[in-house]
């Protein structure tokens, strides 16, 4: 099933559909339409849910069968208020699917997201994006100076 959000095509299936199949369908659609960026949102997974972590591994295997370089980015999105639990979460996701970077959300409230430094350092991962609200335009490229300044405000 395809719909559009802000004039961007979105591929979706019914709840409970095989995640790897949905991503494969989206990949095939992107290729057919000469779209060069595909974002697969696999939100809602906890590192303690083995079956959902195995789904992520399957998604990666399916994509690699069709493009040995895929996925080109594998970002872990961390809730800015999650605290030290995010370290274990990042370790498990990295071990499972080899992350390429980090993003942090919910920095529009009291959360500071300071745990990102520990994760970035221990896993040698760049911080790519920060989320400062719920609108699509509230996802911003990470700027280290601005982030550090905000930590001390």
Which stretches of residues belong to each language-model region?
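P-loop NTPase nucleotide-binding/switch module
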Residues: 13
């Amino acid at each position: 099933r395809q719909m559009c959000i802000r004039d961007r095509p979105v591929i979706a299936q019914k709840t409970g559909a095989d995640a790897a199949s949905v991503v494969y369908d989206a990949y095939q659609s992107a290729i057919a339409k000469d779209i060069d960026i595909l974002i697969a949102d696999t939100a809602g997974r906890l590192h303690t849910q083995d079956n959902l972590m195995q789904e992520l591994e399957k998604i990666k295997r399916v994509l690699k069968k069709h493009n040995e370089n895929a996925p080109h980015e594998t970002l872990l999105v961390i809730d800015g208020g999650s605290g030290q639990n995010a370290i274990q979460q990042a370790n498990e996701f990295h071990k499972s699917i080899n992350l390429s970077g980090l993003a942090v959300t919910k920095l529009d409230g009291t959360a500071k997201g300071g745990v990102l430094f520990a994760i970035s350092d221990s896993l040698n991962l760049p911080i790519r994006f920060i989320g400062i609200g719920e609108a699509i335009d509230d996802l911003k490229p990470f700027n280290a100076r601005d982030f550090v300044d905000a930590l001390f405000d």
